Amino acid sequence: MAEDLEISKGSKEEQYENLLPQIEGLLTGENNQIANLANVTAALKEQFNFFWVGFYLVDTENELVLAPFQGPIACTRIRKGRGVCGTAWQQEKTLIVPDVEKFPGHIACSSLSKSEIVLPLYKQGNIIGVLDVDSDKLNSFDEIDEKYLTQILKLLDN
């Protein structure tokens, strides 16, 4: 349960290692996608204090729509190929952006966002959305985030 989330200190990798089984426990036995997406965003926000963490889900063949998130209000819709989220969706790959100001076509939902990682979310082999994580610091994301966030997203593919 959310109130039982154990926040850990230590290296980024140690924090993910501690969080991963807790997220798995939150998701076990719950089939409602919205509930699971909401709990994942809350757990990530609580553990890492990211500026913004949330999901965008495929709404039409060319547009993502905002889904559960934690953080300031956000862009509601993002077109395929636009910004970091739309590009990650179009390319079906993880994008790590050390400085969002240098990303061509970046959509500034908040001027406080400085770096970002976006990962595709799959269900039964089909991309159904993206996980978007923003930091208010430059160069916040790396291959450790990609590795563990990918593992978390695999838990949602049920």
Swiss-Prot record:
Recorded GO CC terms: cytosol
Q: Which Pfam families match?
A: GAF_2 (PF13185)
Gene Ontology MF term list: L-methionine-(R)-S-oxide reductase activity
Q: Which family does it belong to?
A: Belongs to the free Met sulfoxide reductase family.
Source organism lineage?
Eukaryota, Amoebozoa, Evosea, Eumycetozoa, Dictyostelia
Write the protein's name: GAF domain-containing protein A
Ranges for the GAF domain? 32-158
